[in-house]
């Protein structure tokens, strides 16, 4: 099968429609050749609506070819909209726990990621369960290879799966509740990746138009109207209090956060982006999971000439093995920096000093990338939050 990774909209001498149809036919032929197998659909450790809906679509398509699939992830689903999506649609998910049997799977399928954002990538590699399919819309990362690859620079992975459905890999029917819920989840996945279709291209518009006939509008409204938790609001408040603005970039550290509240960081970045004269927001904090800690951050931008993937990779660099700390797509990005042996300190004063160190270092990286001077003088409130000196 082809491993060609050239963006499909850029294949010379051929229309996009012809190439995309070839991809759906190629996927169908591959699935037919693997009939009777059991596949693990691997999502990123912290799945979003695009990943959840795309994984579900792949599972339903694969079932037509006699392939049993399990949607699996290792982290958490903590964003309130993602929790609502899972509860309302009853998507079957498996959260990996240490010791779970992964040898039961014949192959892996990576949707909305290319193995760089899932710890399961290494777990499956260690037992020689090889990737069969990669479908994604992020920048090419070359972490893994698969027999079938469809990576496109478009708004959402859910757009690609909607296209597969439009081309006959699955038939949606308004009279079948599960198909209606799938269509609704795909619509939510596309909307969430494109700021309600504002950042979407023609592919997203066509996909949304197609899905509109099959979605449950009231369910979609229920998902979108879920209230923010108190903890999310607290993190947004911290982000507002601690933000520093330079050249229309708003950068803020929010201190230590529980792993359960990880999704509050991108929500805080979304909120900071709404401020007047801000085109890019970056929010980060230290996520604590037992004795493990890492700096986790989220970037949001509405500046059309700014590529979050390039920005984060150039600002933060990579590990000794060449794995970048950050990456992204159009309008959004994220990063993770392991803290290593400095994690797990129980002394409050040392933890305060550690946060101050990482906060200053991360800000320095971003200010250097932006090309402005270092952070303004800061003072600490009694709660340890950073405040600008006037």
Region annotations inferred by a language model:
Residues 1-3, 132:
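Non-Sec secretion/translocation targeting segments of pathogen effectors
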Residues 3-41, 45-46, 56-67, 142-280, ...:
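A structured phosphate/pyrophosphate-recognition subdomain
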Residues 34-103:
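Anionic-ligand anchoring segments at beta-strand to alpha-helix junctions in alpha/beta enzyme folds, i.e.
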Residues 84-85, 104-109, 248-258:
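Short, basic, glycine/proline-bearing loop/turn elements
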Residues 87, 92-147, 169:
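Active-site cofactor/cluster-binding pocket
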Residues 93-96, 296-313:
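Acidic, Ser/Thr-rich peripheral helices and adjacent loops at domain boundaries
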Residues 312-314, 318-320:
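Flexible, small-/acidic-enriched active-site or ligand-binding loops
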